[in-house]
Amino acid sequence: MADSPPNDHPDCFHQAALDEAVGRLVSIIRRERPQVIITYGDDQRGYPHPDHLKVHDISVPAFERAGDAMWYPWAGEPWQPLKMYYSVWARTRLIAVHEAMLAKSGKSPYDDKWLNRPGQDERITTRIDVASHMSARSGALRAHATQVDPKEPWWFGLNDDELATAYPYEDWVLAKSAVGAPDADVVEIDLFAGIEEVIALEHGQSFPGRLSSPALVETEVGEVA
């Protein structure tokens, strides 16, 4: 974490030169040509891990510069991703998991410090139902045993089925979009929403009542006040 000796090591990720790191990520984006990029959010006050902060600081300018030939001409043919999302931990999720743990065993690892912490629920634009993929999600966490204790109730106090019942979602904030943004009262259920229409318009097809112009206008939503 911040101020710990490992973060002072010149070769650690936290100390990486920003422009060099952005250029390297731009090179990957131009090679892989993703339509959607997900990254850590701009509001990391709840868990300000230096590496998470660095990922955000690198990925945002990389998203913006990957489609501009003036940036990093050595990094390949320009490619502009269409959407960028920030991951977010919803307070609604925390409460749901906490209550499910209490119902299961009478105890929960979440104390008042966590339960009273403000969430970012009001910023959520996109909610994906991942109930059928919980085993892949938990398996990915267990694969990083040096980072996440596979016996830690914080992460694994509920089994996959119990977690899917308590809170079957992953939540996201649509941070940047070249395909528009959902209405304020609409929650997206697909990270690729709107992209099919843009691709179709670029090929001369139409989607009446959805997108009226093939012009891409970048829209930023979900900013921190």
Model-derived segments and spans:
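Metal-dependent de-N-acetylase/amidase catalytic core
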Residues: 3-11, 15-224
